[in-house]
Regions:
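Class I S-adenosyl-L-methionine
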Residues: 48-55, 59-65, 85-175, 180, ...
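Flexible loop/N-cap segments at domain edges
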Residues: 66-67, 71-73
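Short, solvent-exposed amphipathic alpha-helical segments in soluble enzyme
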Residues: 78-86, 104-109, 157-161, 186-188, ...
């Protein structure tokens, strides 16, 4: 009763009060109350009310930049799912599945802002301006991005645009595609006998941008994951081998990672491009290069992976050197 009266006094409209209690009941306050941590809950609810009154006085909404993970809706974080339920508007990318969108509130407006190489339905600048305009209307905007928003997701640019307009922003990390793809394909990204580091690289550079450091990417004893590299696969292989990578170095392309239709095309730098072309692989797909790729084949041969890893089955195509 005490907090109900205090909230009613601080937040004048029914909508504002509803939003406040939604955040409280679905967030850490409720968890702390159930855990008997009433002092922590009291502090958290004070912070939440202060945040709500600050937003109210500014007359603006807020934006959640949310990583949706690599595809499987069960890989959404709890916080991502909670903010999806709170959002009035969801701006989503090309790689966001219907199963993930179904986690949003039923009455939330959905706006597609997808982009792909060479074909932008909406430009990045238009997306950023739309987020700003919606927030200035007092709406809660969920910017839903595949994987993690700060790993080749241009989330940093969106954060800069919003903070420049003094719009409240919450960033929610997601499982980046490399982690999800490797786990579901049974490929450890690091291994003390084979890879002491892992590098995430983009498969295509911005026009006029700096070229990748191929000597560094070809260095042995590491795993390299290329995002958005399917169309550049022959070039990537040629550059790596020219920089000293072995032709028999294991490599794999993972298509539609973590989804039921996932496929893994495995081979070596010598024959991978040919295998991928024969399998007619389509985007989205990741390229993994390193000795750890061979461990997947070992696990399958021992059938241990069937017991512990959600591997793609009939669609798998494995070619070993």
């Amino acid at each position: 009763g005490r907090w109900r009266r205090r909230v009613g006094k601080a937040l004048g409209s029914v909508l504002e009060r509803r939003r406040f209690w939604e955040r409280v009941l679905a967030g850490p306050v409720a968890t702390q109350v159930f855990a008997g941590q009433e002092a922590h809950a009291e502090l958290e609810i004070r912070r939440e009310l202060k945040r709500a009154t600050t937003v109210r006085s500014a007359g603006v909404g807020e934006v959640y930049i949310v990583g949706a993970g690599p595809g499987d809706p069960d890989l959404l974080t709890l916080k991502a799912a909670r903010l999806l339920q709170q959002a009035d508007v969801v701006l989503y990318d090309r790689l966001i599945s219907e199963a993930v969108l179904d986690r949003a509130r039923r009455d939330a407006e959905r706006i597609y802002v997808g982009k792909e190489a060479g074909r932008h339905h909406v430009t990045q600048e238009q997306t950023q301006q739309l987020m700003i305009e919606l927030a200035l209307q007092g709406k809660r905007v969920c910017r839903l991005k595949g994987g993690d928003p700060f790993v080749f997701g241009r989330g940093g640019e969106e954060l800069q645009a919003l903070t420049a307009q003094h719009i409240p922003v919450t960033v929610v990390p997601g499982i980046t595609a490399a982690l999800g793809a490797a786990a579901y394909a049974g490929i450890p990204l690091t291994h003390r006998d084979h890879a002491h580091s892992v590098t995430f690289a983009t498969g295509h550079a911005r026009e006029g941008g700096a070229a990748p450091d191929w000597q560094e990417l070809a260095r042995p004893g590491q795993t390299v994951v290329f995002y958005m590299g399917l169309s550049q696969l022959p070039t990537i292989v040629a550059e790596l081998t020219a920089a000293g990578a072995r032709l028999d170095l294991p490599a794999a392309v993972i298509e539609h990672a973590t989804l039921p239709e996932q496929r893994v095309i495995a081979g070596t730098l010598r024959d991978l491009a040919e295998c991928v072309a024969a399998a007619q692989v389509r985007s989205p797909a990741l390229l993994v290069v390193g000795e750890v790729v061979a461990l997947r084949g070992e696990a399958r041969a021992k059938e241990a992976s069937r017991l512990t890893l959600p591997l793609a089955g009939e669609n798998d195509r494995v070619k070993r050197a």
